[in-house]
Amino acid sequence: MRILRGSPALSEFRVNKLLTACREQQLPVTGIYAEFMHFADLKAELNPQELEKLEKLLTYGPTIQEHEPQGLLLLVTPRPGTISPWSSKATDIAHNCGLHGIKRLERGTAYYVEAETALTAAQIATLEALLHDRMMEVVFAELTDAQQLFSVAEPAPMSQVDVLAGGRRALEEANVSLGLALAEDEIDYLVESFTKLGRNPNDIELMMFAQANSEHCRHKIFNADWTIDGVKQDKSLFKMIKNTFEQTPDYVLSAYKDNAAVMTGSTVGRFFPDPESRQYTYHHEDAHILMKVETHNHPTAISPWPGASTGSGGEIRDEGATGIGGKPKAGLVGFTTSNLRIPGFEQPWESDFGKPSRIVNALDIMLEGPLGGAAFNNEFGRPNLLGYFRTYEEKVTSHAGEEVRGYHKPIMIAGGMGNIRAEHIQKKEIPVGAKLIVLGGPAMNIGLGGGAASSMASGQSAEDLDFASVQRENPEMERRCQEVIDRCWQLGDKNPIAFIHDVGAGGISNALPELVNDGDRGGKFQLRNVPNDEPGMSPLEIWCNESQERYVLAVAAEDMPLFDAICQRERAPYAVVGEATEERHLTLEDSHFANTPIDMPMDILLGKPPKMHREASTLKVSSPALERSGIELNEAVDRVLRLPAVAEKTFLITIGDRSVTGLVARDQMVGPWQVPVANCAVTAASFDSYHGEAMSMGERTPVALLDFGASARLAVGEAITNIAATDIGELKRIKLSANWMSPAGHPGEDAGLYEAVKAVGEELCPALGITIPVGKDSMSMKTKWQENGEQKEVTSPLSLIITAFARVEDIRKTVTPQLRTDLGETSLILIDLGNGQNRLGATALAQVYKQLGDKPADVDNAAQLKGFFDAVQTLVRNDKLVAYHDKGDGGLLVTLAEMAFAGHCGIKANIETLGDDALAALFNEELGAVVQVKNDELNAVLATLAAHGLEACAHVIGEVEASDRLLITCGEEVLIERSRTELRTIWAEMTHKMQALRDNSACADQEFAAKQDNRDPGLNAKLTYDVQADVAAPYIAKGVRPKMAILREQGVNSHVEMAAAFDRAGFDAVDVHMSDILTGQTVLDAYQGLVACGGFSYGDVLGAGEGWAKSILFNAQAREQFEQFFQRKDTFSLGVCNGCQMLSNLRDLIPGAELWPRFVRNESDRFEARFSLVEVQKSPSLFFSEMAGSRMPIAVSHGEGRVEVRDAQHLAAIEQSGTVAIRFVDNFGQPTQAYPSNPNGSPNAITGLTTQDGRVTIMMPHPERVFRTVANSWHPDNWGENGAWMRMFQNARKYFG
């Protein structure tokens, strides 16, 4: 083993955060210095040239002042016996650079700790807990201890459970020790089954059975028979859900039988490379819509980042594994937790009811979990466009006195939508002899028993089992697997995939049997063929672990050469682990121990284990009405605006890429001031049409504490009012995912669950004509623990989270909450579907005064809700609405405030027609919406509402004004007169506090200050050219299309939209993978243009873009090709984002690029996804010809975009050379260092450069994602089909003549 020191690992502000954490733990630590340590496991000693190459390879990241280490060494490394994702990617890069003497690279972090006094063993243990993640890392005291990273353990054997001699008792003991969560009748079933087979079960067989038959996988409660209050019910919960499909099967193409549901989409030109020529082209066909929403609650409670990350990853795999290959497109995440209690910002309603030590508190869940979910989506390359966040934790009256209801076991929702070809919706037959394949990453000893663990209430399984059941993420691997799936479905009827499932709960022990069972086959498997990064694992651990980023497939033997070629090109690992058999029998052979760990008929595993029967009793609790004597109106406004369910959530949004794919038409951020208040998410179905897809969410979980049915109905209703202002058409076009969370078995909750499912499945949805073709349930929403000898528990309310999905006819019609003051006189109309009842039970108002109230809002009239949707659709289609915002948490007051924030304007409202109870009128959460309409169309709008039966509930309540005030009166009485800026500041406090705790606090402070600037003119565009003119048109007309290499490396994710932009500009865009160049299949001589695309090549291991660049620089064949290409005078090149970082590292090969800087970690120390204003500079860049002086917004999505120069002279030389191509500017048009206008902190606001001759340009922002006007988060009204950035690509075509 060779040890190589790396660069410092922590920025100054990260060190300060760590020192603060030490102080909070009363540790006498005075200083911490951390640096990366690299460990190389060698086949043979490296020669001097190889060593120099390796040292260069391991020099990456921002330049931070190095120290000579001193103090106590704590070396944090991955767990011995595991191979980290960093290791596998860094080793790949080393091999691609020709360093074949390296067996493996691994990385650790060496912390050198100085203290006032020598640390005790207990203090060191406390410090270690701050420095490492005990689930995947260890702490060593010496650098040489890292040798253990490369030691190979001997495989552990399996064990048996002696049922034949020990009977039921032996299995009961195994049930506890292995954490199987088997029910009593399942234990009986297994004892009987193995007694009949005349042999003892192996531990691996029991774990496999437990996973496959866990509540998590089998949904026993939803399939159970029910007796309620002594009356036998004639339908199961699942049957009531399926009733929605029986009543309204319209537009549903697949339901209840696959990894995701499928609905009818649009006929459009799908843009992807031709499988033969690899040239990108449009394929006119149906792009049907797939949809899925998952939960990952248990792992997120234990370890929030990996819990939420693998939750998103698993849901993405569900979409990819639909039919025989789907394409994930856009994602959502949601969180419900107990109270945040932000230090120094604790709110009056936030009591502390304690928690068990093994789960994370709500604050840490929300500081870490969202980053995990965002990071996976970002690296995979899926925009995250939707979400919600609610907190609830309160003592409420129950049938047995008082109890604490809340979310110590959080809800973590991960969902999304994608597209699928018509001929791929149904899975094919699995031929006998078909190869059974595991595609993706290796097995690791993580996530053991996840399915069974998440089926238990938190606290029922031993703490080490809880930690064993959390998985680890590697999104770049999942991206590679999806590229394989994409190449397969793009082959159309030649798609080699016969059957595919994702690997989720229970690992391959669940996925492989499910695969062959669903194909009506058996399987013969070889355990030692399973790719395995931990040789010491037992057969149970290899078979049942939940290592992520894996799929199982059946591929006919004759299709294997094609499948193999695809995997080789995409560098996606796979292994043939078995063959499909005619006989429905499961055999697993272990060549190492020469035995058969599994040998059982399929029917024992997946036959008919005993069906559950639930007995339930209805328990209704009366709750007192809201006590209002202590409520002052203006204080109520402030409290409600600070409640997390209401407050601004920017800290959850800008961490997630919202522009990747170039198909995003509506993200969370609305208008020129980018305020996060969008009602729903909208995507374009293709680059060549205005058809699209929309998704929205609805949830009102606290209402279930008063009325189970009302809570469920409101969730459906809110999802509808959120999505209503997109151009959908008829209501039955909307399809729902229903995610049910319940503390099953808690007194009254089972009957409540039945009531809620019946309310939606048997009553409301059939009445609306809406189908629920997909969903998920989590039935163990309770946390129990002992504290000072006292038994404590926190129980979640019944929680239904609804996600609505719909096809969109015209994405340009979507109406946002942004109020406009530049369209003449306008009025505001409230459409009140509560019909003046103004019920205050379980509202935000009640919560912030630590109350529940009595009567909640409800959907009393399904026909009226349908009339509302139809009316809004008519108004949207006829362009009658200026702005639209649904009424939700916080009521009318919050709806009006958020519309004013989005429009940066004032509101004058009079609520006298809403009854004589102003508090109830302003804070009730009955369904409805506020719309802004032009006064000359007011009567027509009111007539449309009346025609749909809404005359009595439509109230003209006010007008919009160009001011900084929110004025609400009741007749002559002034109720509220506040500065909009002041309210906007209160609304932003939570997001500021969370950002300051999590990110660079100086950046958080700057952003908070910027929101308080009432003079801010917002985003704007000032162009020096005609956006409608196409300067490439004359050259396109000649019929000559120059060839453009759309270059990607593993982990790149922005290549398709890049190809679409160049295709539109008149180029033949060709898909070129780095593996094509390294294997000599492609030569760059054939191309006139080259573009290096954005994403996360090698998962940003060895620095963003640096690993990709070094695999070129240190590979003789690749280096020669690129060098020759750059030397040719008839070529041009572009690098965007990751491609910009990569090309900047090739500066030695590019003429005129000598002064280019490096691009390193953002100032905020966070991935930044913004819609930022830039100005084009005067430069030689051919891309920006005649664009100098233009100012317009552009998509920014990166974690490492800060320009780093050697010194002030280097920066001055760059400026003097005239090669700066674009700069960030503030909304006043001035180059800026201020965050977030300058989202990465680059000096002189530089974010794009070119060469002296202008033929090569690099830039961090993404013009390819916003080349269409509809893909811009905000744009001027007068732009046509092409957005301002299309000119860049047209200029490139013009350059070739």
Swiss-Prot record:
EC number: 6.3.5.3
Subcellular compartments: Cytoplasm
Xref: SMART domains: GATase_5
Lineage: superkingdom: Bacteria
Residues that bind Mg(2+): 718, 722, 886
Metabolic or biological pathway: Purine metabolism; IMP biosynthesis via de novo pathway; 5-amino-1-(5-phospho-D-ribosyl)imidazole from N(2)-formyl-N(1)-(5-phospho-D-ribosyl)glycinamide: step 1/2
GO BP, sorted A to Z: 'de novo' IMP biosynthetic process; purine nucleotide biosynthetic process
PANTHER family given in the database record: PHOSPHORIBOSYLFORMYLGLYCINAMIDINE SYNTHASE (PTHR10099:SF1)
Assembly and interaction partners: Monomer.
Name the record gives this protein: Phosphoribosylformylglycinamidine synthase
UniProt source species: Vibrio cholerae serotype O1 (strain ATCC 39315 / El Tor Inaba N16961)
Taxonomic lineage: Bacteria, Pseudomonadati, Pseudomonadota, Gammaproteobacteria, Vibrionales
